[in-house]
Amino acid sequence: NGDDVYIWNKGDGSDVIKPGKGTDTLRFGEGIASDDLHFARNNNYLYIYVGSEKDEGVKIENFFYQYDRERETVRFLEFADGTVKDLCAGGFVLEQFFPNTGIEGTDNDDVIYGSSDSDQINGEDGSDIIIGGKGNDILYGGKGDDTYVWNRGDGLDRISDPDGTNSKIVFGENIVFDDLTFMNENDNLHIFLNGDRSQGVVIENYFANSRYRNETLVFADGSSFNLAENGLTLTQTNGDESFKATDFDDVIFAGDGNDEIEAGKGCDILDGGLGNDRLEGGEGDDVYIYKLGGGFDTVYDKQGNDKIAFGEGITLDNLSFTEGNNDLKIVVNGDEGQGLLIKNHNGSGKIEELLFANGSSIGIAEARQLVQAMNAFAPETSSRTDENGSLSVTDDYIGNL
């Protein structure tokens, strides 16, 4: 018991301190400054290394158990130049000296460095700075507004941070926003560097829960991008996927496969790519992209001034229209496997305009007249009926509406 003083000098080796009751001091000898010390945590033990090697320094048993409960332990570090460091006055700069073990911070503001291996780091409470380093790290920020640092070559790190309100992901030198690509996989936001899926950051549960959407991307050139306030350009895989976007203005490239896309509330651009896709624009003024060979897509829309934009090689003359069960079916070049089905076209799901790559367009009123005229109008100069009985209405007829 009592306020004890422990003395450690260069060359003293690796000592273990088992504090009793009292507020204790660890006094370092000549030639040792505060900047010479490295701190590490393993379970509840605090390791203080002098220099970068692990064979010189002090281990304080149960330090963090006492620290977290504001109980007495070794509190002060004294140096020969007269400076004093209070170990309980703030957070720590912690390094990973123990491979294949996790790193935990404190309830104060810590700086935590991972190793070149794949680490698991838990910042606990406090606004921490977490540098995972190389390897595929798992990073938990805990409470507080945390900062995650990622540099080129750092691998693919996973971040879980539901408790912050203004956390940051800071990218290192020579990384700008345009270098990043975004993808939704299993409701996690993947941010890849230059499209390399082994390099970047994964924000877990980003699309599943708004609590996880609190990060701002910060770049070395001073620019930033707030993920909680802006839409994304999502570039998906070529497999069959079911995913959602944000409630902001998104651009979605689904790739190949039979995909199901839920765009949210923003003014979105949805490109289902190849395959038979389900596209749900939601609220907002949405644009659905359809290109030759794009399969047969089903569009579910709700509100807004919405459009279908057809790609190169598709004009109004290539389309045929069929209306039934309150839906509008648009077939391309008479191929029933190519086109779109607009669900609830006569209700909240209507599409207001069709756009073409040649610059022409047709409004919803004209499209509805086309549907109504299909069985009543068949002059050879204005329309033609293909071998399947579907009506393809020409530009000449549109001009006369």
Residue ranges, per PLM feature:
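Low-complexity acidic/polar repeat-biased segments
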Residues: 49-101, 192-234, 331-401
